[in-house]
């Protein structure tokens, strides 16, 4: 089972009674410890049942997560809203994608693909979300719920020919799958947004944090060079999104992903982002600066918070995207993960930094990364990997022989010294797409690390997690050089 293989630590040789230890108080410098990614609900969790969700929520609680993303059942609530707006059920269902594509539907990038959703699906998602939210709240977490971002079904656009809807494109999909977004000045924006919050809270109870992203990886349809028009439109959208949320719950806080501000850094210059934020109260917005690992390894820029002066007074969360697209190869810049957030925390330019987060698009891979990031949420300082890795090995495998320590030194210097968003095995490059091929480490040093890891079998073979990782690392290396 994937959960047993990855999302746990070792309980081998557990004593009948535990020895006394002196108490140590560990505090966090962060008000919020965020976890999950909109895309996780497509790459990993779309078909999870309550049993699997319960384990993941327990995993979060044990690592101090207090602000998880919770978007299950978004479409069931949206369906109620669109029915109240006069649409027919079949037109609403045609708007939704299939379950595995719902993250991109929620961000307005994709409609109708692999849909529709069934009545049974909608009802079961409501039941599941009740269990998810109840458990999160029982454990002291404040979940981030979805909010209206302006995207409407084609049937709604057809009912209102008087409105000049803006058409947004994404990913090269045909126009019939693209989004129509309400112009910010129409009263429908506030009306629909208010209805969504009300319907959500009627079903699931009061919530404080609501996620809304209107332009993720999409550009506004504005004339090239018309900066004044662009900034005016962005300011209107920021104002409309905020007021549509506040109309449903005056105490609510608008949460938005900062991914696209770095991903499309040419579009989101300082003046453009300042315009979007300009009409939103500072205490009513949180920006999740999602992918602080991508400026170095993919975009070739400064980290987004640096480019935008700590987000101009808004609260923000320092986060990484340690997994892209649910990929499984061993990758991740451990040294960056052990230092970069601490550097931000102590920066004079950090602005109102209030949280730390991990936003993997896919789970059940590279567990060392998730454990390291969980620990970074509980320290204001960098972590010394030479000291931390043996502790990790003891927790995961029940021991750390000298050969294990040496193995992880080699892993740290090879596969875990970089991050690649599109890693490919040899068998995946028969028809190569050079834009999406990234280096995978096949060095002698990595092979030595695998051999050293396997040499620990005599002392650690009773650890199921050691056996799991030994098989995974060996098969991973063989797949790189032979397949």
What are these regions (language model features)?
Residues 424, 429-481:
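Histidine-centered catalytic/metal-binding microenvironments
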Residues 30-49, 60:
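Active-site-adjacent substrate/metal-binding segments within catalytic domains
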Residues 1-7, 11, 482:
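Single conserved hydrophobic/aromatic residue that forms the stacking wall/gate
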Residues 15-17, 36-40, 61, 66-412, ...:
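Catalytic-core regions of glycoside hydrolase
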Residues 24, 48-51:
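Catalytic and substrate-binding clefts that recognize carbohydrates or anionic sugar/phosphate headgroups
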Residues 12-31:
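N-terminal carbohydrate-binding accessory modules
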Residues 415, 419:
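Catalytic and binding regions of secreted/periplasmic enzymes and modules that target cell-wall glycans
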């Amino acid at each position: 089972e994937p959960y047993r293989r990855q999302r746990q630590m070792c309980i081998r040789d557990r004593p009948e009674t535990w020895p006394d230890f002196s108490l140590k108080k560990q505090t966090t410098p962060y008000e919020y410890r965020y976890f999950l990614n909109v895309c996780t609900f497509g790459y990993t969790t779309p078909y999870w049942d309550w049993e699997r969700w319960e384990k993941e929520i327990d995993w979060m609680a044990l690592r101090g997560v207090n602000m998880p993303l919770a978007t299950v059942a978004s479409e069931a609530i949206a369906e109620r809203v669109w029915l109240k707006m006069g649409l027919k059920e079949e037109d609403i269902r045609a708007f939704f994608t299939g379950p595995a594509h719902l993250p991109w539907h929620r961000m307005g990038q994709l409609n109708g693909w692999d849909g529709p959703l069934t009545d049974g699906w909608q009802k079961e998602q409501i039941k599941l979300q009740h269990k998810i939210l109840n458990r999160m709240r029982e454990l002291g977490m404040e979940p981030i719920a979805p909010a209206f971002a302006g995207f409407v079904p084609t049937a709604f656009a057809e009912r209102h020919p008087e409105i000049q809807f803006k058409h947004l494109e994404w990913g090269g999909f045909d126009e019939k799958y693209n989004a129509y977004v309400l112009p910010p000045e129409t009263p429908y924006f506030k009306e629909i947004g208010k209805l969504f919050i009300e319907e959500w809270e009627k079903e699931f109870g009061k919530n404080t944090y609501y996620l809304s992203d209107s332009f993720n990886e999409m550009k506004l349809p504005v004339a090239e060079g018309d900066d004044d028009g662009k900034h005016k439109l962005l300011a209107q959208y920021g104002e409309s999104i905020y007021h549509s949320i506040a109309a449903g719950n005056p105490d609510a806080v608008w949460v938005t992903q900062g991914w696209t501000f770095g991903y499309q850094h040419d579009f989101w210059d300082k003046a453009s982002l300042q315009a979007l934020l300009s009409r939103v109260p500072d205490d009513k917005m949180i920006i999740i600066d999602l992918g602080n690992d991508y400026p170095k390894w993919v975009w070739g820029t400064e980290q987004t918070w640096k480019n935008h002066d700590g987000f101009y007074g808004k609260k923000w969360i320092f986060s990484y995207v340690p997994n892209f697209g649910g990929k499984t190869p061993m990758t991740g810049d451990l040294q960056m993960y052990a230092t970069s957030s601490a550097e931000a925390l102590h920066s004079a330019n950090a602005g109102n930094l209030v949280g730390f987060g991990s936003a993997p698009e896919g789970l059940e891979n590279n567990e060392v990364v998730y454990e390291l990031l969980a620990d970074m949420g509980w320290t204001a300082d960098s972590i010394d990997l030479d000291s931390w890795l043996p502790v990790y090995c003891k927790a995961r495998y029940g021991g750390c022989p000298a050969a294990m320590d040496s193995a992880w030194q080699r892993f740290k210097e090879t596969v875990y010294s970089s991050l690649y968003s599109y890693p490919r095995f040899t068998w995946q490059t028969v028809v190569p797409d050079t834009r999406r091929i990234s280096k995978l480490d096949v060095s002698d040093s990595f092979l030595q690390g695998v051999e050293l890891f396997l040499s620990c079998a005599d002392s650690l073979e009773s650890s199921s997690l050691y056996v799991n990782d030994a098989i995974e690392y060996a098969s991973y290396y063989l797949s790189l050089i032979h397949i």
